[in-house]
Amino acid sequence: MKQFEIVIEPIQTEQYREFTINEYQGAVVVFTGHVREWTKGVKTEYLEYEAYIPMAEKKLAQIGDEINEKWPGTITSIVHRIGPLQISDIAVLIAVSSPHRKDAYRANEYAIERIKEIVPIWKKEIWEDGSKWQGHQKGNYEEAKREE
């Protein structure tokens, strides 16, 4: 387990939560994002995630650094799963601890928004009658590689 990582296997939540705990932390907020069955009235069969792993892990660590600058004393761990994910599977987990709960909540919300903005992860939604790629705001895989 790494503090910031992309994985293929199902996410085991407890190890990431435990990573953020020490004697100075008074709160831990854990967010898990799951695959939902229905989106805007369309039934999802499953999702497929892809990532440019070296850069994605660097960007996840960058988010951890940003959080520590904005909310000193926090400890963050972020993991995102790639590959095919079934309904209710965990796609992303963010664990943030801090001396006080407000910082942990704010930092956790900040993390999920930054993941969507800067981490090169792409999501393909597969429905009964088709599919569509969604994802990273900065473009495709080749563009992400050039940024490295």
UniProtKB/Swiss-Prot annotation:
CDD domains: MoaE. Gene3D superfamilies: Molybdopterin biosynthesis MoaE subunit. InterPro entries: MoaE_sf, Mopterin_biosynth_MoaE. Keywords: Molybdenum cofactor biosynthesis, Transferase. The keyword Transport does not apply. Its EC number is 2.8.1.12. It comes from the Bacteria. Pathway: Cofactor biosynthesis; molybdopterin biosynthesis. It catalyses: 2 [molybdopterin-synthase sulfur-carrier protein]-C-terminal-Gly-aminoethanethioate + cyclic pyranopterin phosphate + H2O = molybdopterin + 2 [molybdopterin-synthase sulfur-carrier protein]-C-terminal Gly-Gly + 2 H(+). Coiled coil: none annotated. One of its GO terms (biological process) is Mo-molybdopterin cofactor biosynthetic process. Substrate binds at residues 34-36, 44, 100-101, 116, 123-125. The keyword Transferase applies. One of its GO terms (molecular function) is molybdopterin synthase activity. Belongs to the MoaE family. Heterotetramer of 2 MoaD subunits and 2 MoaE subunits. Also stable as homodimer. The enzyme changes between these two forms during catalysis. Converts molybdopterin precursor Z to molybdopterin. This requires the incorporation of two sulfur atoms into precursor Z to generate a dithiolene group. The sulfur is provided by MoaD. PANTHER family: MOLYBDOPTERIN SYNTHASE RELATED. This is Molybdopterin synthase catalytic subunit. It comes from Staphylococcus aureus (strain N315).
